[in-house]
Regions:
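Pyridoxal 5′-phosphate
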Residues: 1-480
Length: 480
């Protein structure tokens, strides 16, 4: 039984959990909402979290007044900001049970930048102009395994890197064929570099990947295991070192998906044994111990410093740590129980709506992510109607998971080729997809019913409940 199934076995069990409405209502009261449309329901949490007023206030009122660059401890403001930055880094490391051998880098704007950084540091990337030359001379490629559930950032990035990529086959019921993985690893026992780069949970269905078992399998075959926590990090425990067999060699996630997290950087944490570089991937200010006019220089030995060239994301890292702190104060046990309670409410409502189905609905225990297909309404129209006519914010498309979409929608090669040929000709309306609804534990039962009512109204072609929104007020009015 995996961690998403650890305490509940049926939806009926879930519905009996005390909802603890007062606690979650208090959390919700601090979420920054649309001032013009207070009744608008945000159900796109897997794409982005929302701002949390106590965090915004603390950054503005406490951090803002002392804002300064780091890279110095001689001045008071420089010393304070450097201290706060290091404290924030420790909060993040402790949250994932990183060891003293693990390196933390805050990179880009999400896990995409974090994974790109890892691939470049490992030397598995080059510019397309040089790709053919490099491949001709590099010898045996590293071998990378991914699952059929990956989103594009953990798929196409590997396709375009200097590795051989294999997708672990899917089994019936949307499961993952781990026996195939073990057999393939055995057959590749002479391959020098092997790794799995896998999602902890799907951003399409919310189904958890058995990444602990995969980590153990990979390590038994002297291979690495990298885990993408982009969809699940705001809601689940993350432990890089649970035991000697299931440790994680690298993890990456997107703190902007946390409540309170928008405006943060991507997070990459990896074991320093992976790092063999003499030259940082991005040389710059803060990476050198000294330089001189004759082209000589020496890089700092500390990996975290030498791989964080230029001014670090100071506010971004502090915000990440505060979002992590908020998650810990909410508690993953509370989050899990609330998720399953809200999931049961929404599943029970959707199951009764004709012309609507949830993808992989056999997996009831999941993160609060529902990808919905309307029989008689295309996903783009459905999302527009949900937003404009019923004030429910969702997301349409393939959720940047086209390969998984082929599996979920049973698209064979011939059908896929017909579609992609037309997409190449810019007929974007033919692109298959779904409507993704994603929830947060701080949402109320009333909001879940509003979402379900809106889905039913769209499926039935009901009239709009609200007038189309007016043009958004410009944020670029004069500031002074």
């Amino acid at each position: 039984m995996n961690s998403v199934e650890k305490s509940l076995n049926t939806v009926a069990d879930t519905a009996e959990i005390a909802p603890n409405n007062d606690f979650w209502a208090r959390i919700a009261s601090h979420v920054v909402a649309d001032p013009d449309y207070q009744n608008r329901v945000y159900a796109d949490w897997t794409a982005s979290g929302r701002l949390f007023k106590p965090i915004e206030d603390r950054i503005s009122n406490m951090v803002g007044g002392l804002m300064a660059n780091t890279h110095t401890e001689d001045s008071y403001t420089g010393r304070v900001m450097t201290t706060w930055l290091h404290e924030a880094e420790q909060v993040i490391k402790q949250h994932v049970n990183a060891s003293s051998e693990d390196i933390l880098l805050n990179v880009g704007s999400g896990m995409t930048g974090a994974l790109a950084k890892l691939i470049r540091m490992m030397g598995w990337w080059c510019h397309e102009q040089h790709r053919s030359i490099v491949l001709e001379n590099m010898g045996q490629k590293p071998l990378v395994y991914i699952t059929h559930r990956e989103h594009h950032s953990n798929h196409t990035m590997w396709i375009e890197s200097l590795v051989e990529l294999r997708i672990i086959p899917a089994l019936e019921g949307d499961e993952i064929d781990l026996e195939w993985l073990e057999k393939d690893l055995f057959n590749e026992k002479n391959r020098k570099i092997k790794m799995a780069s896998i999602t902890a949970a799907s951003n399409v269905t919310g189904i958890e990947t058995p990444y602990r078992r995969i980590a153990k399998i990979m390590h038994e075959h002297k291979a690495y295991c990298f885990v993408d926590f982009a969809a699940s990090a705001p809601y689940v425990d993350i432990d890089m070192h649970p035991n000697d067999e299931e440790w994680l060699d690298a993890i990456f996630f997107s703190p902007h998906k946390f409540l309170g997290g928008p405006g943060s950087s991507g997070v990459l944490i990896f074991n320093k044994a992976l790092y063999q570089n003499k030259v940082p991937e991005q040389p710059g200010g803060g990476t050198v111990l000294w330089t001189n006019p004759w082209g000589e220089h020496r890089f700092i030995s500390n990996i975290e410093q030498r791989e964080s060239g230029g001014t670090p994301g100071i506010l971004q890292t502090i915000k990440t740590a505060m979002a992590v702190q908020l998650k810990e104060e909410m508690g993953t046990k509370n989050i899990y129980e609330r998720e399953q309670y809200l999931n049961a409410l929404l599943f029970n409502r959707i199951d009764k709506i004709d012309g609507v189905r949830v993808l992989s609905d056999n997996h009831k225990h999941r993160l609060s992510i529902f990808s919905i297909v309307f029989e008689n309404v295309d996903y783009k129209t459905a999302v527009q109607r949900l937003s404009n006519d019923f004030h429910v914010e969702t997301r349409g498309g393939c959720a940047c998971a086209g390969t998984y979409g082929h599996h979920l929608l049973n698209i064979d090669y011939c059908t896929s080729k017909s579609i992609t040929d037309q997409l190449d000709d810019e007929f974007q309306s033919l692109k298959p997809g779904w409507v993704r609804v994603s929830l947060h534990p701080c949402m109320s039962e009333s909001e879940i019913n509003t979402i379900a009512d809106a889905i039913e109204n769209v499926a039935n072609g009901a009239n709009a409940m609200f007038a189309a929104p007016e043009k958004t007020q410009s944020i670029w009015a004069p500031l002074i």
